[in-house]
């Protein structure tokens, strides 16, 4: 049974994902990425920007500059000055958490229409600067927060028996799926073409033809005997994403088609050295809270930080690869960290629509320093007026 008070998604769009420092989006500032995503979703849905009551965007690699960039980009997209804008930073989970925050504001009645999303120009910042603290302190878990994501992925892979060949095979599969989806036009509905200079950019730049033979000779990045290489790890990227949510009643009044219903969001903590298993903990807790089993979920999008990391998650969750990341993931598409959480919502809903998957879909990411996030959506083929409760 559906209700007029349900929180629903009426649009989920993103920019193409550019390769950081050398891609076609490298000349764009953060605020320009924001403008592209927000303007794109306003134009695609046809919503009057004056109806948007709040904007929350995920962003990671800056604080003050990010807040200013978000505000500038949103204003330039046509959203009025009266609409408040803020950024949040839960690292790779930021974009998905923004969706959860806007949804909860709508559910609580504080707003009726809101925009979520995320942005990141990793070109602008490159790799985060390393810092050190003395090891062997009083709190081992606190010290483990300094572990790089690659180190954590290597440890998880070793613990769960992920081999180099398995990681490479997964990476090749991700690239092949993304390339096939691109050729078939499956991303067209979620990507906002961008005019950069004299060129229109409308494809993700990280997707490429590859094979085991071309990547098996690459050297490990984090350990000499490790499994993580530049080919089976996510890419540094530039991009932005946007998700428009509102009450179902408002969608009906505005004549906007419902893409999916937002059900729930969760953030969890776990040992920092187990960070890569964040999706396992988050998904299991999310499903339990909503009285669901994994076999009741039609489809999963789990962010591909590293092939070894996502393989560990699939093994722990006991989910077949055919139910996950059918159009590839961050290994192929790229990982603009502040935007990726909302990006996987875009792709989750694209897959479910294109593949005619009804029922529940889950989006999830691992998050640095020992966290995981997950969100639950429901997609139906349609509803009749008598199916709607006047609540």
Curated annotation (Swiss-Prot):
Gene Ontology biological process terms in this record: fatty acid beta-oxidation; phenylacetate catabolic process
Q: From the UniProt record, list the reaction(s) this protein catalyses.
A: an acyl-CoA + acetyl-CoA = a 3-oxoacyl-CoA + CoA
Q: Which GO terms describe its cellular component?
A: peroxisome
Which molecular-function annotation in GO is an example for this chain? Answer: acetyl-CoA C-acyltransferase activity
Catalytic residues, per the record, are 92 (acyl-thioester intermediate), 335 (proton acceptor), 366 (proton acceptor)
Q: Where in the cell is it found?
A: Peroxisome
Alphabetic keyword roster: Acyltransferase, Fatty acid metabolism, Lipid metabolism, Peroxisome, Transferase, Transit peptide
Q: Name one Pfam family in it.
A: Thiolase_C
Has keyword Disulfide bond? no
Tagged with keyword Acyltransferase: yes
EC number(s) from the headed UniProt entry: 2.3.1.16
CDD domains, per the entry = thiolase (cd00751)
In which pathway does this enzyme or protein participate? Lipid metabolism; fatty acid metabolism
What family does the Swiss-Prot or TrEMBL record give for this protein? Answer: Belongs to the thiolase-like superfamily. Thiolase family.
- Subunit details: Homodimer.
**NCBIfam families tied to this protein:** AcCoA-C-Actrans
The molecule here is called 3-ketoacyl-CoA thiolase, peroxisomal
